């Protein structure tokens, strides 16, 4: 046997054990990653199942904002008070649905038509200028997900949205949303928002007040109490005209 043939045989004999070890290590790594992924999904699922009958004390977004606020005000606290669904003005429920997700009662967490339109507009503008998140998707972001845009976030958001829509009723989804959504710097939920902006409880909000709160939602920290802008006036008027047609649980 030639020396070249002997060298080739030894190289093959040496490479096979290394290849088997590499494949075994890769398989174990993938298996551990899969187990971790499933465990994370069960963690999300367990929280949503628990919140079917229990109220979340805070959200990931609220906790993140509190850390930021306390950088300037170490003793700062969030304005937040949970109120049950029946103690939230029906005007506010309709105004928020009209403003944020007018197909809320008819979809299963995703408004595909709105998503397509938003995608086309973003492509046309060459940047992200429009979104199409439903109330369910917004709630998922508030409850669980960080504010950073990372590659896995959209996939995880979609998975949790399916869990949310499967385990919770539309009434419960809207109840939680209205109790945790941001309505000012450090102001969360309908009760705190109604008192902060208008000095009344959430159940007593008028149609005009409800429409004004709904108009603030895209950028609530931009509107301290008493501030009035042309955009806010126009947006409020639009919501007022549409809210009577909004379907709510």
What does each of the following model-derived ranges do?
Residues 2-8, 14, 18-249:
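Juxtamembrane regions of bacterial inner-membrane/periplasmic proteins
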């Amino acid at each position: 046997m030639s020396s070249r043939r002997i060298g080739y045989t030894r190289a093959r004999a040496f490479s096979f054990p290394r290849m088997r070890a590499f494949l075994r290590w890769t398989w174990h790594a993938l298996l551990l990653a899969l187990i971790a992924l499933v465990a994370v999904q069960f963690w999300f699922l367990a929280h949503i199942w628990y919140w079917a009958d229990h109220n979340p004390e805070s959200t990931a977004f609220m906790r993140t904002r509190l850390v930021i606020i306390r950088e300037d005000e170490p003793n700062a606290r969030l304005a937040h008070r949970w109120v049950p669904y029946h103690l939230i003005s029906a005007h506010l429920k309709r105004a928020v649905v009209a403003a944020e997700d007018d197909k809320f009662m008819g979809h299963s967490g995703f408004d595909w038509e709105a998503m397509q339109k938003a995608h086309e507009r973003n492509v046309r503008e060459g940047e992200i200028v429009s979104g199409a998140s439903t109330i369910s998707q917004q709630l998922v972001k508030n409850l669980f997900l960080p504010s950073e845009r990372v590659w896995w976030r959209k996939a995880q958001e979609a998975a949790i949205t399916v869990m949310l829509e499967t385990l919770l009723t539309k009434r419960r989804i809207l109840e939680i949303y209205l109790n945790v959504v941001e309505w000012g710097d450090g102001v969360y939920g309908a009760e705190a928002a109604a008192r902060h902006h208008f000095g009344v409880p959430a159940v007593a909000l008028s149609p005009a007040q409800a429409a004004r709160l709904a108009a603030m939602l895209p950028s609530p920290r931009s509107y301290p109490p008493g501030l009035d802008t042309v955009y806010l006036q126009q947006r409020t008027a639009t919501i007022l005209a549409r809210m009577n047609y909004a379907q709510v649980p």
